[in-house]
Amino acid sequence: IHSSAGRRALVETPGSYGLIGANGAGKSTFLKILSGQLEPTNGDVVITPGQRLSFLQQDHFKYDAYTVLDTVIMGNKRLYEIMKEKDAIYAKADFTDEDGIRASELEGEFAEMNGWEAESDAATLLNGLGIETDLHYSQMADLTGSQKVKVLLAQALFGNPDILLLDEPTNHLDLPAIEWLEEFLINFDNTVIVVSHDRYFLNKVCTHTADIDYGKIQLYAGNYDFWFESSHLLIKQMKEANKKKEEKIKELQEFISRFSANASKSKQATSRKRALEKIQLDDMRPSSRKYPYIDFRPNREIGNEVLMVENLSKTIDGVKVLDNISFTLGHDDKVAFVGANEQAITTLFKILVGEMEPDEGNYKWGVTTSQAYFPKDNTAEFDNDLTITDWLTQYSEIKDATYVRGFLGRMLFPGEDGIKRVRVLSGGEKVRCLLSKMMISGANILILDEPTNHLDMESITALNNGLIKFPGVILFTSHDHQFVQTTANRIMEILPNGTMIDKITTYDEYLASDEMAKKRHVFEINEEDASDN
């Protein structure tokens, strides 16, 4: 891929290129220009002739009239057109000689494109992402939002494209699907350009990192961690070089000022003037990246009794999402709830904060505890006409506007933003408001349901560090692998039948544990036996 500005090569060799930058830096816009969805204001994009480009569609309703399998095969537009034209010819009642010639031509092209393997290849992608075989002939309109995301991702991956563009491919994917995608991309031989806020994902799949800052792209031959270390080292080296140059400039200026009027030293002064003119300080323009300051400080230390849950059960729409759940929390527990059963996790969190009643069982918070809750669906929180400042003030014991604005400032809301109406905030801004609310509460128990959704990488990093330092108890769920691994010291997984696995361990150790895999396998075997019966 080349840009017309100086015919600069953006991608010269196959590999996986991670495109990073602050929110608003232009990552998604750049991908849309590469894919032809947007026209550039200046210049153009040249792709090597004969190469096929595929990209992840963002419109989840575009294919509602088609089957799941057809939607995936549409990832190779020409192959799908051949299939449909071929089927239309064979369906004719009056099949002519011309139809026979055309059908023969199509069959030849179809065979060259491995058309006979198309359905099985599409099915393999769907199964890998967690779309079971019995859904492959369903209409897209009948699928859930998360299932549609997986189908559209399979569409982008279908047919071994030469260039693959993925904008936030891990959004709304469960962890098994993310792991499958990681392995797929690691083994993918062609070019991938991916935008993601998932640091673990970028580290695992990317061979190169392209950093967008102030409209310019800087390419690094390494993954996200390599970029982070290299870019910081480069800034450090530039600062040191500038310091030496500034010292040299001062030395030359002093000599010139002292001896420029001295006849015997005039030649030396002139020489130093030329030397001074040649010294150029490196441009140290600060990055457009901004990190919020996230610091949860409990008003009260937690006692020994934190939370006791006994025999908790809940059925929703005829499905038992929680089945006899029991556990006890200690005062230093940071619990990550993992697995594909997201409804069960959200239900448990809602019960624990009093928004929902269990069908059976009970729970009890310790007398020294206070809870702050981050809901997955925050619509109700912002369904009002309050300004940001007034919205946060209602949750603060101290009603002083300056005090409240201090918390907003830490979350990248400058003074003038305080008069914005919360109803019109972006997804990321609403998340930062909710985190401000949790900080100002002084709670010693934090319950967070998918807090990393809608956040940029800088905010995720800041939240990650804030939770690591937090001296209280945390219950949370997230699809960000590194976020879970670095925050949690205990893992709970609610299985599809509503029962739970509970293990004091890190996330990576949990995934690698044969014992945990065996428990899941026993559950799957029992489910299959029940289905057979």
What are these regions (language model features)?
Residues 117, 264-268, 278-288, 364, ...:
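Proline-centered turn/helix-capping motifs that create local helix->coil transitions or kinks
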Residues 1-242, 295-533:
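ABC ATP-binding cassette signature C-motif
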Residues 230-283:
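Intracellular alpha-helical coupling/juxtamembrane segments of multi-pass membrane proteins
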Residues 292:
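Conserved catalytic-core segments of large NTP-driven translation/proteostasis enzymes
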